[in-house]
Amino acid sequence: MTNTENYFKVGTIVNTHGIRGEVKIMAITDFAQDRFKKGADLFIDTKQGRIPVKVQSSRLHKNMWLVLFVGVTNINEIEKYKGDDVYIEGTARPELEDDQYYYDEIIDSTVVDLDGNKIGVVKEIMETGANDVWIVQRDGQSDALIPMIDDVVKSVDVDAKLITIDALEGLLD
């Protein structure tokens, strides 16, 4: 996709599922149940350009979304999209509360401690029952798991992609 400015990646088609045209999508989005719900408008980013599709049905299966698009009836119609990314239009994103963020606003953000020392870069977000956990890649060390709670996360500057945390004792061990 040449211009992704008004589009947001929500997943990647990793494989087909069965012979009736379903695809397995590895979601990299918050609100996945809304992104892939029946009637949702998505765009497949192909080498030939962006192709609009509409979700006919979807379900979660083994941490992947199995999605069938309207008009697709067999594997031959969809197999060519294996490996392609799936996007939503930017206008499809609702406003969030002040202390809530979209994944793409957090991923690749630099994490620093209260003194401004770099800890690492957020590479992934893990959803847990209580709160999200940011997986921070550190240079020459194992990844740090940063819980998205008020006691730890002190500020998030989405525009600067900078997150300041209070590295509580034992958090970075």
From Swiss-Prot:
Keyword Chaperone among record annotations: yes
Cellular-component GO terms for this entry: cytoplasm; ribosome
One GO biological process term: ribosomal small subunit biogenesis
InterPro entries for the chain: PRC-brl_dom, PRC_barrel-like_sf, RimM, RimM_N, RimM_N_sf, Transl_B-barrel_sf
GO molecular function: ribosome binding
Subcellular localization: Cytoplasm
Top-level taxon of origin: Bacteria
Chaperone in keyword set: yes
SUPFAM superfamilies: PRC-barrel domain, Translation proteins
UniProt keyword annotations, A-Z: Chaperone, Cytoplasm, Ribosome biogenesis, rRNA processing
The protein's assembly and partners: Binds ribosomal protein uS19.
Domain comment, as recorded: The PRC barrel domain binds ribosomal protein uS19.
Record function comment: An accessory protein needed during the final step in the assembly of 30S ribosomal subunit, possibly for assembly of the head region. Essential for efficient processing of 16S rRNA. May be needed both before and after RbfA during the maturation of 16S rRNA. It has affinity for free ribosomal 30S subunits but not for 70S ribosomes.
Name used for this protein in its record: Ribosome maturation factor RimM
Gene behind this protein: rimM
